[in-house]
Regions:
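Single conserved hydrophobic/aromatic residue that forms the stacking wall/gate
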Residues: 1-11
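Short glycine-rich anion-binding loops that position phosphate/pyrophosphate groups of nucleotides
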Residues: 66-68, 112, 188
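Protein kinase-like catalytic core scaffold
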Residues: 61, 120, 168, 180-184
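A charged helix-plus-loop insertion that forms the helical arch/lid used to bind
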Residues: 12-16, 190
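A conserved helix-loop-beta module that forms one wall/lid of the active-site cleft
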Residues: 16-76, 81
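Glycine-rich phosphate/pyrophosphate-binding beta-alpha loops
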Residues: 186-200
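Short beta->alpha transition motifs characteristic of CBS
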Residues: 125-128, 185-189
Length: 200
């Protein structure tokens, strides 16, 4: 009813709430990124323990609930199939299994899109975690020019393809071989982007 009334009154909702159907569901988010030729870690949808055995080539990996979960909640690090015995996992919801990367560092980037061709892109932020909790962030991130340009290019592409008007944050991984991956999209400044309040 609310959406119908908004259309009748010509009210534009920004950011578009439909975006949440993509970015708050990990499997949908990864598929969206793949369709736009944006590199992610290898992944598969998991609905039961047999699926993990089927995709054992993704181990060692991280098993994550497709929805909800943050700061390590709803996530299980699996070294191998035997490691399943060390966790109490209830397969009453959908998961995704992501292959671990040989991580060198994590960065994030805040972008605000006002309209077509009207952007404000902040410098990449370097993040350090302890036990899957963000400890601190520094800006600018200590990264090479290629990663700097590619992270901004992908963040801009994501906001365009989502037709996003507002502020979002894209989280990236850089592995030891200097490959760049998008880990997740947050439809807000993200905890790593709070420094933009006072740093600019």
């Amino acid at each position: 009813y609310l959406h119908r009334r908004q259309r009748q009154m010509c009210i534009r909702d920004s950011p578009n709430p439909e975006v949440n159907k993509i970015v708050q569901h990990r499997y949908s988010e990864k598929n969206f990124l793949g369709k736009n030729n944006i590199r992610t870690t290898k992944f598969e949808k998991i609905v039961n323990e047999n699926d993990i055995k089927k995709y054992r080539d993704l181990l060692p990996g991280i098993l994550k609930t497709s929805t909800l979960g943050y700061d390590g909640k709803g996530q299980y690090k699996l070294k191998d199939l035997e490691d399943l015995n060390n966790h109490e996992i209830r397969f009453d919801k959908e998961f995704i299994l992501e292959k671990l990367v040989n991580l060198e560092k994590e960065i994030s980037l805040v972008i605000t899109r006002f309209s077509k061709d009207n952007y404000e892109i902040y410098e990449p932020i370097e993040n350090l975690h302890e036990e899957q909790i963000l400890k601190y962030s520094t800006i600018p991130a200590q990264i090479n020019l290629s990663h700097f340009k590619k992270s901004q290019e992908w963040a801009k592409l994501i906001s365009e393809e989502l037709q996003y008007v507002g502020t979002l944050c894209v989280e990236f991984f850089i592995d030891k071989d200097q490959n760049l991956y998008v880990n997740e999209i947050a439809p807000r400044v993200h905890n790593s982007g709070h420094l933009t309040i006072n740093a600019y």
